């Protein structure tokens, strides 16, 4: 845990200077990454140019670490640089260091060469862009001995250049381990018996040298479990030959991986020798291999991944490992589960006791090989401080090496100082490090790919979600006041607030629209890996910009109704509709139809809500559906209230008591019943639930308790009035929830602006559901003839068709009008009042 101590000021006269210094030093503290264990701040500062380093190390090492920044011969303050013991570091390991800056000079003391490398990284951070050095003492060392990555994912492995860059990055981040274990390297796994080709071997040698230069231990992992015969002398010799070849190119650390294999012994000789006990066969191989390596490399400790690497509790297999595996061997575990949601001190203690050996965690974060449509760029979370029985962590990164650096920086921070680790703070500092002067651009991309774990907390699109919610809340208040109050000042104030929040949301959508160009310019390597995600965000930005442009136009024009309509207002609404249709077309044919890169579970509901706000300005009431259940992909709540049982809402987890689905009819209506249709030829429906209605959303009346079947038509014995409908689950089941329809059965439907319910439904389908398709023809009838200035249509670009727009003045005789032959087209209509289209 970081300890910050302030020394007492020496002179009262410099009180203001002391306060200023504290602010400066706090800024410098935030630059030191990972978070140091102890930092003691003084009250003075000194000109940087007054310092120089006195190197008390070997000349070769001095040349390797030379600082040209503070090497003035005229410097009056000397900072000695040494490798050795000091009383302040006596309780720390061999990566500990001390930095002390005083009025007389100072010292940098490191326990080892690697520790000196880390000390100088910290010192560089301390003097970066500085003109003065603060009076400070830093005592620092990592919590865990092993800190790094394991390239252990499936699918496309990293390039050689990416690996070389990664080991440099690890060293600069004070991580010390790189485990080479790419599942798609055949010479590591399927062809483990065969030697590496010369070209590949040369690349490995270069990578080993790069790791050594950055004080990173290169661990070569071999994975023979798919085909090895444990009792075969030939296979044993091939394993040793492969190992010797790796030692010859400078590798001194090894791991034996027995994960993701058939646990059964395949050969008759193995079954005869080991009594069909595959744990015994594995342990025998591991112990022999450890003995061989220890003889070749004194002090070597083999790391082993057992076949049962993630299960809870013990088993005969794990008991064999516990009692018969060499105590010098380190056991790899992923924690409880292949992708562990948490690793707490209690869980770590249990895992250590299960195996009876030192544990290193193969942490499957931020790996995304199991979900290639996601980037896991959130900070590491759910790992407890200083876990018992734990030597360290190696984190399995994403296939995207450059984009992995953000979460990996937070992993470096956690493994260095776990007690002081705060995920959100660490993430912000990592963004600043990687983003530099363009960190706003980097942050905008990263925060739109914030995913912790597949079953854990999702925090994607936090800014967009916040801005959208603020606008929707403001608009709801404005719309309610507009209906119920004639107090113009209040209305104007609410309108101004709504417009301000809408403009803020529009700015964010426009920023997303331009993000790809900025990211490609500032971060070209990351942009190559992020290309499909950047395109997706650009599309979201374009759609959102269209929608917010539309809403700004109509909100500034004012509500459209039969009593307020003017030619100018109709013209504004016509332009707004055209803009909206462009966004809708992009959403339907470019965003939804594209590869499901990135998440649509957040943005689609936002766009759906914006579409409903748009629709609400054309119709007095719009049915709005909501839920407290997470949404699966684009199966949004609106699908359950679109009068189309072919579309549906779908949750993304099993049902729990208290899960609800609610419908707001927009105003109090008179109902004769409710239609609740769930499921879709499966068990995804509320297996027991209660249906309630309410006029105000506060007082609820239960109208039915349902169970056993997915479809229900609830008929009231006498008409009831309600604005809200709600169905709430009462039991816990593994099945998700599908709702195809949850709609009222009206006794009498109130209408506004001359539209009958057919028009409302058709409009809402088009506005809310981009998948609504007209098969051959559609007729829209109005309750009374009204002037219609324009009509719009969107077509699927993969199935373009020529349409004829016909109109009727009496609802019976149709007159052929314009031909619709473009993908997005808005056409004028004659000035006569129209009854049907």
PLM-predicted stretches and their roles:
Residues 112, 153, 190, 194, ...:
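Catalytic-core regions of glycoside hydrolase
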Residues 149, 156-300:
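Substrate-binding cleft of carbohydrate-active enzyme catalytic domains
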Residues 683-743, 798-837:
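Trp- and acidic/polar-enriched beta-sheet ligand-binding modules for extracellular glycan
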Residues 422-618:
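C-terminal functional modules
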Residues 22-24:
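N-terminal signal peptide c-region/cleavage motif recognized by signal peptidases
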Residues 5-13:
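Bacterial N-terminal signal peptides that target proteins for export
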Residues 26-103, 111, 129-138:
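Acidic, contiguous N-terminal accessory segments
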Residues 573-581, 588-595, 599-671, 677-686, ...:
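Disordered, acidic Ser/Thr/Pro-rich linker "stalks" and the adjacent N-terminal cap
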């Amino acid at each position: 845990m970081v300890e910050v101590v302030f020394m007492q000021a020496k002179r009262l006269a410099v009180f203001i200077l002391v306060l200023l210094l504290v602010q400066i030093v706090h800024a410098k503290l935030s630059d030191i990454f990972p978070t140091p264990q102890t930092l003691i701040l003084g009250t003075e500062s000194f000109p940087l140019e007054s310092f120089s380093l006195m190197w008390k190390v070997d000349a070769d090492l001095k040349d390797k670490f030379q600082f040209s920044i503070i090497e003035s011969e005229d410097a009056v303050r000397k900072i000695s640089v040494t490798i050795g013991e000091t009383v302040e570091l006596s309780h720390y390991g061999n990566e500990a260091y001390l930095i002390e800056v005083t009025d007389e000079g100072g010292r940098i003391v490191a326990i080892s060469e690697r520790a000196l490398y880390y000390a100088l990284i910290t010192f560089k951070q301390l003097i970066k862009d500085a003109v003065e050095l603060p009076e400070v003492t830093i005592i620092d060392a990592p919590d865990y001995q092993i800190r790094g990555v394991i390239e252990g994912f499936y699918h496309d492995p990293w390039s050689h250049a990416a690996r070389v860059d990664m080991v440099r990055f690890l060293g600069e981040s004070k991580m010390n381990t790189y485990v080479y274990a790419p599942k798609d390297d055949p010479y590591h796994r399927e062809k483990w018996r065969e030697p590496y080709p010369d070209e590949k071997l040369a690349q490995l040698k270069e990578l080993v040298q790069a790791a050594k230069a950055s004080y990173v231990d290169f661990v070569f992992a071999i994975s023979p479990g798919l085909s090895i015969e444990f009792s075969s002398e030939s296979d044993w010799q091939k394993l040793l030959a492969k190992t010797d070849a790796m030692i010859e190119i400078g590798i001194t650390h090894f791991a034996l991986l027995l994960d993701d294999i058939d646990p059964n012994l395949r050969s008759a000789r193995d079954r005869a020798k080991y009594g069909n006990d595959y744990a015994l066969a594995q342990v025998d191989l591991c112990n022999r291999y450890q003995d061989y390596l220890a003889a070749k490399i004194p002090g070597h400790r083999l790391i082993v991944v057992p076949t049962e690497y993630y299960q809870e509790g013990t088993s005969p297999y794990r008991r064999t490992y516990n009692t018969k595996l060499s105590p010098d061997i380190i056991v790899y575990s992923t924690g409880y589960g292949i992708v562990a949601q948490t690793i707490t001190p209690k869980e770590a203690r249990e895992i250590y006791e299960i195996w009876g050996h030192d544990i290193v965690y193969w942490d499957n974060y931020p790996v995304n090989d199991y979900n290639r449509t996601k980037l896991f760029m959130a900070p590491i979370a759910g790992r407890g401080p200083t876990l018992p029985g734990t030597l360290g962590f190696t984190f399995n990164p994403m296939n995207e090496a450059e984009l992995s650096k953000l979460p990996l920086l937070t992993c470096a921070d956690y493994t260095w100082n776990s007690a002081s680790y705060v995920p959100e703070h660490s993430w912000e500092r990592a963004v600043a490090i990687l983003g530099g002067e363009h960190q706003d651009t980097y942050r905008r991309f990263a925060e739109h790919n914030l995913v912790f774990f597949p079953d854990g907390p999702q925090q994607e699109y936090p800014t967009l979600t916040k801005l959208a919610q603020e606008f929707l809340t403001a608009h709801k208040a404005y719309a309610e006041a507009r209906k119920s109050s004639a107090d113009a000042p209040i209305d104007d104030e609410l309108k101004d607030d709504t417009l301000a929040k809408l403009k803020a949301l529009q700015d964010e959508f426009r920023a997303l629209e331009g993000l790809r160009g900025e990211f490609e310019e500032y971060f070209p390597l990351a942009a190559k890996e992020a290309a499909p995600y950047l395109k997706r965000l650009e599309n979201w930005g374009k759609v959102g910009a269209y929608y917010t442009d539309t809403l700004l136009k109509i909100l500034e024009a004012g509500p459209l109704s039969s009593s307020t309509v003017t030619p100018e207002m109709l013209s504004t609404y016509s332009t707004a509709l055209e803009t909206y249709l462009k966004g809708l077309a992009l959403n339907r044919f470019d965003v939804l139809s594209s590869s499901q890169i990135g998440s649509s579970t957040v943005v689609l509901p936002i766009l759906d809500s914006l579409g409903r706000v748009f629709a609400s300005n054309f119709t007095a009431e719009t049915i709005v559906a909501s839920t407290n259940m997470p949404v699966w992909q684009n199966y949004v709540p609106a699908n359950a209230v679109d009068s189309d049982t072919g579309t549906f809402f779908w949750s993304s987890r099993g049902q729990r008591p208290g899960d609800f689905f609610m419908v707001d009819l927009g105003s109090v209506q008179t109902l004769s019943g409710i239609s609740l249709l769930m499921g879709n030829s499966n068990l995804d429906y509320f297996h027991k639930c209660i249906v309630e209605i309410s006029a105000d959303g506060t007082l609820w009346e239960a109208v039915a308790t349902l169970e056993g079947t997915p479809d229900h038509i609830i008929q009231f014995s006498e008409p009831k009035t309600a604005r809200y409908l709600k169905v709430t689950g009462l039991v816990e089941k593994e099945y998700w929830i599908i709702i195809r329809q949850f709609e009222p059965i009206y006794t009498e439907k109130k209408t506004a602006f001359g539209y009958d319910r057919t028009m409302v439904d058709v409009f809402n389908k088009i506005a809310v559901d981009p998948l609504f398709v007209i098969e051959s023809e559609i007729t829209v009838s109005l309750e009374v003839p009204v002037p219609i200035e324009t009509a719009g249509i969107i077509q699927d670009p993969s199935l373009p068709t020529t349409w004829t727009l016909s109109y009727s003045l009496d609802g019976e005789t149709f007159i052929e009008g314009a031909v619709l032959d473009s993908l997005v087209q808005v056409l004028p209509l004659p000035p006569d009042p129209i009854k049907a289209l």
